[in-house]
C-alpha cells in the first residue's frame, strides 16, 4: 500500500484553503434553503457565537487535511496489520488532529463506494456542522455534517481503544456480510488544542439519511429501565429520538423482507456477542412511501446489479445474506415495506462487558428487581434484542 509507514507520526498539515472546493453561490443558496427545514428537524447550525463553533471549525480543517493524506496515498489493497495500528498526527495552527488507523478506514470507505472527494467536501470547511440534541444519557457531543450524510460523536478513550481493538474483525464481518446493519464507521480521530487533553471522536454514516420525510425516530435496546422519552410538545421544532417504551403498540411491517431482517439481526448481534460488546442500539425511523414508491417493482429494476456486485454465485450471496437494495441514497440502512420506508441500523458498538459493567449489572439487579435493563451479559443482550425485533415485526 502506498501509504505512510506505520506507527505514530507528526507532520505539518496542509491548509484546506489550498485545495478545498469553493462554496458556490448555488451551494450557498441550497444551505440557506435548508436552514428552515433543519430548525424544524431539531438540528441547530453551529455558527459563530455557538459555544462549539471553535471546536467544530478545528474538526473541519483537521478532517480536510486528514482526508487529503488518503487521497494522496490511496489504498491499493485490503488493510495490513500495520494499517490498523497507524497513528498520524497533523499539526495545525493552535491544534493537532490525530488520525487513527487511517489507511484501514480509507480502504473501508473505498469498499463502500464513498469517494474521498465527497467525504472531504462534506466534512471539511464549506458549511457549518449541525448540532444534534440527543436524548442519550452520555456526556458525548453529537454533530452532523452540513449535508446530514455523516454523523460525528465524541467518545471516551476507553471506547476508542475498544473500537480500534475490534476494527480488524469489524472489517472482516463487513466483508463477509456486505449488507450488514452495523453502522459504517468511517474514521476515528483525536483533537488536542494548545497541547491540552485529547478529545476523541468518530465519524460514521448517518443511519437517518436522507432525513427530509422521516416522521418518527427510535433508539431501541430491548429493555424497559430508562427507556421512555417525553415527546416534544405539540408545535415544538425539536424532533426527539424516542425509546423502547414509546414504541409500544407499533410494528415494523416489512412484508417479505422480514425474514432477511431477522437473519441479519441474528448475524450482527452474534458478531457483537463474540466481541463481548453490549449496550448497542437498533435505530429505527419511519418514512411513509409515496404512492409511486409502493409496490414490488417500484425500485427493483435499477438495483439488482449493485446488490449482487461482489457475490460470485447464488450460494455465496445467500451465505452473505445479501438482499436487493433500494435505488436510494444510504441503501444499506433502508428497507421498504408495503406502506413505509424504514431506516434501520445498529449503533454504539464500543461498550465492552468488563469489570465495571459486571458490577453495574449486579447493582441494577438489586435496584430494579424483576425489570429489564441494558447492562446484562452480551449473550443475553443479543438474544433479547433479537426477541424484541421478532416480536415487533411482521
From Swiss-Prot:
Residues 36-393 form the PIPK domain. It holds the Pfam family PIP5K. The gene is PIP5KL1. Heterodimerizes with other type I phosphatidylinositol 4-phosphate 5-kinase. Signal peptide: none annotated. It comes from Homo sapiens (Human). The keyword Nucleotide-binding applies. GO terms for cellular component: cell projection; cytosol; plasma membrane. It is an enzyme of class 2 (transferase). Keywords: ATP-binding, Cytoplasm, Kinase, Lipid metabolism, Membrane, Nucleotide-binding, Transferase. The keyword Nucleotide-binding applies. GO terms for molecular function: 1-phosphatidylinositol-4-phosphate 5-kinase activity; ATP binding. This is Phosphatidylinositol 4-phosphate 5-kinase-like protein 1. May act as a scaffold to localize and regulate type I PI(4)P 5-kinases to specific compartments within the cell, where they generate PI(4,5)P2 for actin nucleation, signaling and scaffold protein recruitment and conversion to PI(3,4,5)P3. One of its GO terms (biological process) is negative regulation of cell migration. The lineage of its organism: Eukaryota, Metazoa, Chordata, Craniata, Vertebrata.
Amino acid at each position: 500500500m502506498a501509504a505512510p509507514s506505520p506507527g505514530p507520526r507528526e507532520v505539518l498539515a496542509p491548509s484546506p484553503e489550498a485545495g478545498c472546493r469553493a462554496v458556490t453561490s448555488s451551494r450557498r443558496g441550497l444551505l440557506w434553503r435548508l436552514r428552515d427545514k433543519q430548525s424544524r428537524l431539531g438540528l441547530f447550525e453551529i455558527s459563530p457565537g455557538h459555544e462549539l463553533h471553535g471546536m467544530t471549525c478545528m474538526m473541519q480543517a483537521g478532517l480536510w487535511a486528514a482526508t487529503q493524506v488518503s487521497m494522496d496515498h490511496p489504498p491499493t489493497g485490503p488493510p495490513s496489520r500495520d494499517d490498523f495500528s497507524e497513528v498520524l498526527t497533523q499539526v495545525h495552527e493552535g491544534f493537532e488532529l490525530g488520525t487513527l488507523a487511517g489507511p484501514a478506514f480509507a480502504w473501508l470507505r473505498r469498499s463502500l463506494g464513498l469517494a474521498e472527494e465527497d467525504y472531504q467536501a462534506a466534512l471539511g470547511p464549506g458549511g457549518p456542522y449541525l448540532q444534534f440534541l440527543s436524548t442519550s444519557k452520555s456526556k458525548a457531543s453529537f454533530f452532523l455534517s452540513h449535508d446530514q450524510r455523516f454523523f460525528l460523536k465524541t467518545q471516551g478513550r476507553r471506547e476508542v481503544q475498544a473500537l480500534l481493538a475490534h476494527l480488524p474483525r469489524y472489517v472482516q464481518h463487513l466483508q463477509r456480510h456486505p449488507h450488514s446493519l452495523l453502522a459504517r464507521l468511517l474514521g476515528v480521530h483525536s483533537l488536542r488544542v494548545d497541547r491540552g487533553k485529547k478529545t476523541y471522536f468518530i465519524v460514521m454514516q448517518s443511519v437517518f439519511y436522507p432525513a427530509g420525510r422521516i416522521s418518527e425516530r427510535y433508539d431501541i435496546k430491548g429493555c424497559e429501565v430508562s427507556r421512555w422519552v417525553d415527546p416534544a410538545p405539540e408545535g415544538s421544532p425539536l424532533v426527539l429520538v424516542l425509546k423502547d417504551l414509546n414504541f409500544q403498540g407499533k410494528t415494523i411491517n416489512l412484508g417479505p423482507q422480514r425474514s432477511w431482517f431477522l437473519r441479519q439481526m441474528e448475524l450482527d448481534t452474534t458478531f457483537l456477542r463474540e466481541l463481548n460488546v453490549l449496550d448497542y442500539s437498533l435505530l429505527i425511523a419511519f418514512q411513509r412511501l409515496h404512492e409511486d414508491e409502493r409496490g414490488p417493482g417500484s425500485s427493483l429494476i435499477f438495483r439488482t446489479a449493485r446488490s449482487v456486485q461482489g457475490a460470485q454465485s447464488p450460494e455465496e450471496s445467500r451465505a452473505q445474506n445479501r438482499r436487493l437494495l433500494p435505488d436510494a441514497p444510504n441503501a444499506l440502512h433502508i428497507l421498504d415495506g408495503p406502506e413505509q420506508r424504514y431506516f434501520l441500523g445498529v449503533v454504539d458498538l464500543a461498550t465492552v462487558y468488563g469489570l465495571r459493567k459486571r458490577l453495574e449489572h449486579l447493582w441494577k439487579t438489586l435496584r430494579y428487581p424483576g425489570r429489564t435493563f441494558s447492562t446484562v451479559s452480551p449473550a443475553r443482550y443479543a438474544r433479547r434484542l433479537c426477541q424484541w425485533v421478532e416480536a415487533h415485526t411482521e
